[in-house]
Each structure stands twice: as structure tokens, then as C-alpha cells.
UniProtKB/Swiss-Prot annotation:
Designated name of the protein: Organic solute transporter alpha-like protein 2
SMART domains cross-referenced by the UniProt entry: Solute_trans_a (SM01417)
Organism: Caenorhabditis elegans
Membrane among keywords: yes
GO cellular component, one term: membrane
Keywords: Cell membrane, Glycoprotein, Membrane, Transmembrane, Transmembrane helix, Transport
Length: 342
């Protein structure tokens, strides 16, 4: 048996596999063939994933009903609808990929594209809360002095990053960092689809190279989002909206989703899933990755249902509890004003 160097092992893990699966499932079956040859484990996992996705969609419909009836501003309503659709859309795409193994790549690309778009939406929602970029910068310069740049994803590598003096152009640069991420991701998605449909499995290396090239764009978008949210989170205006809760849910979901793909890919090439029984090794790993994505989407939807109830967030300004809180705050303000004048 020939021994290979650690470098050769790493190259094989990135571009090929350590398994010798000749004579087994080399081609990904069509959905009809796949569904006819399911084992008990696959049947049970598909049943669970379908039920969980139905639950996620039902909760999402409930969210959309509350958003429609209890949010006044149409543009704010649109932003929140787009964010509320993240988990159910990702769950549905993952479920479709479980039933149709050949579309796993398309499912992953579309989900990743939507996550990148959601980063920009969360910043647009922040700007809307403060009535635009100029109003946000004005309030920040009145109450804050520095911009927090020691934030993920670079704070772990550079924990001693200094605070930067707050300026309007720096906030604009952060916004542009976030905005470029979905644009670059859209271009990368289109190029990836061309490579995949043209070269199939032979396009693996170009796809990995493309992911590596576009990684700085994604990291810049995430970094810009974290800088803005971390800096603005110190302002009292955001507390009643629970905006930071919305951001943390999206951020954590995106992080887990993004890390799962390379982890499951590495495990499959290392041999953790064997040669596969119904599907090839790589597709078997992505099948289970999609299963976990469905579960994660449900957890995110359920947590958001509990933490972002209309009675707890000022986003739902037409909800009775929110109106009563607003009237109470205005009464306190009037009393303070009267006392100051006397």
C-alpha cells in the first residue's frame, strides 16, 4: 500500500476523496429512482423533514399575518416580510433538495444568495428606523464618539482592534460593504450555475476557486453589518424594537448554514458517510446537511415567534399593547416637559 504525504492527502480531500467507491453509486439518481429505492432511515428522515417544514411554513404564515395587520409603514413592512421569509424559504429549498438530490447545488446557491440579500435588508431596516442615512449619522454623532470595529468575523483574529472615530463617510463605507455582498454573490451564483451545468462533476475545482475568490466579498459584507449593528446597538431607540434580536437570529442562522457546507463536504471526502447506500458519498452528506438545515430553520422560526411577539416589539406599532406603551411614554414625556417649564 502506497503512503501519501499530508499535502497530497489535503489536496485529495479538497478536490477528490480518500474513498475508493468504484462499482457503487457513481451517478446521482433522478428523483423518481431515488424515491423508489429509499431505505427506512431515508423514509423516516424525509417524513420528519416534511413535517418540520410544514410547521415552519405555518409559523411563517402566522408571522406574515401579524406583519400585515400590525405594521403601519409599507416599506418597513416589506423589509420585515423579506426577513421573515428567510427561514421558510431556506427550509423549503432544503426539503426540495432532499426529495430531488440532483438539485442540491441549486438549492444551496439560492439559499446563500438570499442570505446575502438579507444582510442588506437588515441594514435597510436599520436606516428606516432612523429615517434614513443622514438622520442616522446625525443621531450617532450626537450620542456616540467611536465606531466599534472589533466585531466578527475578524475580532477573533485581531482582538485588539482600536475604536475608530465616528464620521459620516465611515458609516457610508460600511453600508457599501454590505451592499456589495449580494451583488457579488448574484454574479458568483450565475457563474457557478454555468460551470456546474456545463462541466458537472469536472467543474468541482473551478467552483472551489470561485468560492475562494468571492469569500472576501462575503466577509466584508458580514463585517460591515456587524460594525453598523454593534455601534448602533448602544442607542436607546433600538431597544423597544428588539432589532438586535432580529439581527442575531439572522446572523447565527447564516453562520451555521455557511459552515455546514464545507464541514459536510470534508466529512464525505474523508469517508464519514462511506460510499453511500442510495446516493453517492458527497450527495449523501448534502442530504443530511439539508436535513439539519430544515431543523435549524424551524428552530429559528420558533425562537423568533417567542422573542418577537407583537406585544414585545415596537415594529408592530398598530398592536394594542404597542399603542398603550407609546401613549404611556408620551404621557411621561409631557409630565417631564411640564416639570421642566415650572
Amino acid at each position: 500500500m502506497l503512503e501519501i504525504s499530508p499535502w497530497e492527502t489535503l489536496v485529495k480531500l479538497l478536490t477528490d476523496s480518500l474513498l475508493n467507491c468504484t462499482g457503487t453509486h457513481e451517478d446521482v439518481p433522478h428523483a423518481k429512482t431515488f424515491l423508489r429505492s429509499l431505505t427506512t432511515t431515508y423514509i423516516a428522515s424525509l417524513a420528519v423533514a416534511t413535517a418540520v417544514t410544514v410547521g415552519t411554513v405555518c409559523l411563517a404564515v402566522l408571522h406574515l399575518i401579524y406583519i400585515h395587520f400590525y405594521i403601519t409603514h409599507s416599506s418597513r413592512r416589506l423589509h420585515i416580510v423579506l426577513l421573515a421569509c428567510t427561514a421558510p424559504l431556506v427550509s423549503l429549498l432544503a426539503l426540495v433538495a432532499m426529495y430531488m438530490p440532483r438539485v442540491w447545488f441549486l438549492s444551496h446557491l439560492l439559499s446563500f444568495l438570499y442570505f446575502s440579500f438579507a444582510l442588506w435588508v437588515i441594514i435597510c431596516l436599520l436606516l428606516h428606523i432612523f429615517d434614513g442615512h443622514h438622520a442616522l449619522v446625525t443621531k450617532m454623532m450626537q450620542r456616540l464618539q467611536y465606531v466599534e470595529i472589533a466585531t466578527p468575523p475578524f475580532c477573533c483574529l485581531f482582538p485588539c482592534l482600536p475604536k475608530v472615530r465616528l464620521e459620516g463617510k465611515k458609516i457610508r463605507w460600511c453600508e457599501l460593504m454590505v451592499m456589495q455582498a449580494p451583488i457579488v454573490r448574484l454574479f458568483a451564483t450565475l457563474v457557478s450555475l454555468v460551470i456546474y451545468f456545463e462541466y458537472q462533476d469536472q467543474g468541482l475545482v473551478p467552483l472551489k476557486v470561485l468560492d475562494f475568490i468571492t469569500l472576501p466579498s462575503l466577509l466584508a459584507g458580514i463585517y460591515g453589518t456587524h460594525i453598523l449593528v454593534t455601534t448602533v446597538s448602544r442607542m436607546d431607540e433600538l431597544i423597544s424594537y428588539r432589532y438586535v434580536v432580529v439581527f442575531r437570529l439572522l446572523d447565527f442562522f447564516f453562520m451555521v448554514f455557511g459552515l455546514q457546507q464545507p464541514v459536510f463536504d470534508f466529512l464525505a471526502r474523508y469517508g464519514a458517510f462511506g460510499c453511500g447506500t442510495v446516493l453517492p458519498a458527497i450527495e449523501t452528506s448534502f442530504y443530511w446537511k439539508n436535513f439539519f438545515t430544515v431543523i435549524e430553520a424551524f428552530c429559528v422560526t420558533l425562537i423568533s415567534t417567542v422573542l418577537l411577539q407583537p406585544s414585545k416589539s415596537s415594529f408592530f406599532d398598530k398592536h394594542p399593547s404597542c399603542r398603550s406603551m407609546s401613549s404611556a411614554r408620551s404621557t411621561i414625556t409631557d409630565v417631564d416637559t411640564d416639570e421642566s417649564t415650572t
